[in-house]
């Protein structure tokens, strides 16, 4: 290690030793690559997942002196010096603590050596198993897999054929996967891989980060990866309606003097917290600030249940009486048990055990509260004529596609609202790095922003983002200023975001073609040549070609790239109604994902022949075709 790196004082050394001991959950005297990566995730660094992995990979080369995949304390100190010298470790504070209910298993990845430890949460596994058992209990396609036993490893085996994952994705975001594309009978290793590809690429399309998960990981049932993916899928479903344009009653959560625009910027987690506090205030109880420390005694939950339970005076069914006698129980665990008995009366006992409440498990308590909200929101839209309801227009399909694309790449923070969450351009910079546009991070203002002048800091970021787009990325950004991004000007923001997505899509292609620049014409030419050489009668003249509305050129191209992937009896070829076209498109998108194409476009994009999204579909398929040739 070079001498120019930061020196570490004795005090810091002692702190590092203490930190190392906390990370080293199995007291083996070293931490593994996986534990390091988790540590980064826990630290509040404004870095996307892919960046964290890059840092870990690069630093392991430097710090892991004896190349055994394990980091000793001495190596850890030199690693910290490296990080400090790169000014990355300012917020390197949160350390993974050893917790009860953590199951450690031997490392199985090719990077990790024998003896490395991957840990997963037993509580999460139990919660997810119970949730899936209930959600899919009546699905005949899953009868050979359900119910799973929450007390053993059957979850990891049951997910291995991909069927359950596909079903859970459709529960969270209906119609994401065309059921006709799922292989259900007489499964072979190949058809199982297809199912897992379909699940992964569909999860990606609904905004789950899957950059470090492969079909093989799911087939092998690697617990930490399986649980991580499952949580993301479940969360998409739980949060789907915690959004003001989908649920106008949330306007009741407006505070005095607050603009609707401000409320609309809140994340689902923040809205849930505000919803709980709305009911706690009505109950005359103190408010909470989190779903961990503040709910451990179950008392807030008792009041919440009492507030939202049907009183029999509205359309939400017969009255349910909440018994508050358990509120005064002295023992926390018993009190939590009594509280959950009351939640059970509302059919909402899912996700937490009494121990999960008392330990303050933030993930599972968040899920518990989201499920309560979805079942009994107990909110009434105020008769307030001052509110501009035009603001409540939901996001367009195009906006949602862009948002899901960004989130699937692991950007940080997660994008809940396309415009307000891009207002400081941090995510734009991360996307620039992914398309190899260098970002000078020392020029970027990072959160938390000051109360006074904070927006100016965000505008400075946006100015830099536009400057990079024009000068480095060579994007066409005529008439776009930093302020437009900051204010969330839809047309101008979308113009930049589309060019980012286009460049990202084409970068994947040019990487396959040894760096050759790829243009629309090259893609169209390749599509037509591939169709012709497979003796297909379809072709396209441009990405606006009306024949694309039938999806037949897409389906024929898939068949040319991956023979037998398309079942011809599923396709309607003549006298197509609008419904036929949509059915073809749904099938085409799902089969494309099944053969491994990471497609973000929606069936409607094909039916309506949206040239931008059509381009991404053909580009992804070209990537798949070139990959197969290699």
From Swiss-Prot:
One Pfam family this sequence matches: CH
Modification note: Phosphorylated.
Gene Ontology MF terms in the entry: actin filament binding; calcium ion binding
Chain positions with N-acetylmethionine modification: 1
One cellular component (GO) term of this entry: brush border
Cellular location(s): Cytoplasm; Cell projection, Stereocilium
Disulphide bonds in the chain: none
InterPro entries linked to this entry: Actinin_actin-bd_CS, CH_dom, CH_dom_sf, EF-hand-dom_pair, EF_Hand_1_Ca_BS, EF_hand_dom, Fimbrin/Plastin
Region (Actin-binding 2) residue spans: 382-626
PROSITE patterns (alphabetical): ACTININ_1, ACTININ_2, CH, EF_HAND_1, EF_HAND_2
Gene null: resulting phenotype: Knockout animals have a progressive form of hearing loss at all frequencies. Hearing loss is moderate in young adult mice, progresses to severe deafness with age, and is associated with defects in stereocilia morphology. Stereocilia are shorter and narrower than those of wild-type mice.
Tissue specificity as recorded in UniProt: In the inner ear, it is expressed in the organ of Corti. Abundant in the utricle (at protein level).
Residue span(s) of domain EF-hand: 11-46, 51-86
Record keywords, A-Z: Acetylation, Actin-binding, Calcium, Cell projection, Cytoplasm, Metal-binding, Phosphoprotein, Repeat
Biological process (GO), any one: auditory receptor cell stereocilium organization
Domain Calponin-homology (CH), chain residue ranges per copy: 122-238, 266-377, 396-505, 517-626
Binding site for Ca(2+) 2: 64, 66, 68, 70, 75
Binding site for Ca(2+) 1: 24, 26, 28, 30, 35
Residue span of region Actin-binding 1: 108-381
Subunit structure: Monomer.
Function summary: Actin-bundling protein. In the inner ear, it is required for stereocilia formation. Mediates liquid packing of actin filaments that is necessary for stereocilia to grow to their proper dimensions.
The protein, known as: Plastin-1
This protein's encoding gene: Pls1
């Amino acid at each position: 290690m070079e001498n120019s790196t930061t020196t570490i004082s004795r005090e810091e050394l002692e702190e590092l030793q203490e930190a190392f001991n906390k990370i080293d959950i199995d007291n083996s005297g070293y931490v593994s690559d996986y534990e390091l990566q988790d540590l980064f995730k826990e630290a509040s660094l404004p870095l996307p997942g892919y960046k964290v992995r890059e840092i870990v990979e690069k630093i392991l080369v430097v710090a892991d002196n004896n190349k055994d995949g394990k980091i000793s304390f001495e190596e850890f100190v030199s690693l910290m010096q490296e990080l400090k010298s790169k000014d990355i470790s300012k917020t390197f504070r949160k350390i993974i603590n050893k917790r009860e209910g953590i199951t450690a298993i031997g490392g199985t990845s090719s990077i990790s050596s024998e003896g490395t430890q991957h840990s997963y949460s037993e509580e999460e596994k139990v919660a997810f198993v119970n949730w899936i058992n209930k959600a899919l209990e009546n699905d005949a396609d899953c009868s050979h897999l359900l119910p799973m036993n929450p007390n053993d490893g059957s979850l990891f085996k049951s997910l291995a054929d991909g069927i359950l994952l596909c079903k859970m994705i459709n529960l969270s975001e209906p119609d994401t996967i065309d059921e006709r594309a799922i292989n259900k009978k007489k499964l072979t290793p190949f058809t199982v891989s297809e199912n897992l590809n379909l699940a992964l690429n569909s999860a990606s399309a609904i905004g789950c980060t899957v950059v470090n998960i492969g079909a093989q990981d799911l087939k092998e049932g690697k617990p930490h990866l399986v649980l991580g993916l499952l949580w993301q899928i479940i969360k998409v479903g739980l949060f789907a309606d915690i959004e003001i344009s989908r649920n106008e009653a949330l306007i009741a959560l407006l505070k005095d003097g607050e603009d609707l625009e401000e409320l609309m910027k809140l994340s689902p987690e923040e809205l849930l917290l505000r919803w709980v506090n709305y009911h706690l205030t009505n109950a005359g109880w103190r408010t909470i600030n989190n779903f961990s420390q503040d709910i451990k005694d179950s008392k807030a939950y008792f009041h919440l249940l009492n507030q939202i339970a049907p009183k029999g005076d509205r359309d939400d069914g017969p009255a349910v009486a909440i018994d508050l006698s358990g509120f005064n129980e002295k023992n926390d665990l018993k009190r939590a048990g009594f509280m959950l008995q009351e939640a059970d009366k509302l059919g909402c006992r899912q996700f937490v055990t009494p121990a999960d409440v008392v330990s303050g498990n933030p993930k599972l308590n968040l899920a518990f509260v989201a499920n309560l909200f979805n079942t009994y929101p107990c909110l009434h839209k105020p008769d307030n004529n001052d509110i501009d309801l035009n603001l409540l227009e939901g996001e367009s399909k195009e906006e949602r596609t862009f948002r899901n694309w960004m989130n699937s790449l692991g950007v940080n923070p997660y994008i809940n609202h396309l415009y307000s969450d891009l207002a400081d351009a941090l995510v734009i910079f991360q996307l620039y790095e992914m398309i190899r546009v260098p970002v000078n991070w020392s020029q970027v203002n990072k959160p938390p922003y000051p109360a006074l002048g904070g927006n100016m800091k965000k505008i400075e970021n946006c100015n830099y983002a536009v400057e990079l787009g024009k000068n480095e990325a060579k994007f066409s950004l005529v008439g776009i200023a930093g302020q437009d991004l900051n204010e969330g000007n839809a047309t101008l923001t979308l113009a930049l975001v589309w060019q980012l997505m286009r460049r990202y899509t084409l970068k994947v292609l040019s990487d396959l073609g040894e760096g050759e620049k790829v243009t629309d014409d090259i893609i169209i030419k390749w599509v037509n040549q591939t169709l012709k050489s497979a003796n297909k009668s379809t072709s396209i003249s441009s990405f606006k070609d009306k024949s694309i509305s039938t999806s037949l050129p897409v389906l024929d191209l898939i068949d040319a790239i991956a023979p037998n992937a398309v079942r011809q009896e599923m396709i309607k070829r003549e006298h197509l109604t609008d419904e036929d076209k949509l059915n073809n498109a749904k099938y085409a998108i799902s089969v494309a994902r099944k053969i491994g194409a990471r497609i973000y476009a929606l069936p409607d994009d094909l039916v309506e022949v949206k040239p931008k999204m059509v381009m991404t579909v053909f580009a992804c398929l070209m990537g798949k075709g070139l990959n197969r040739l290699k």
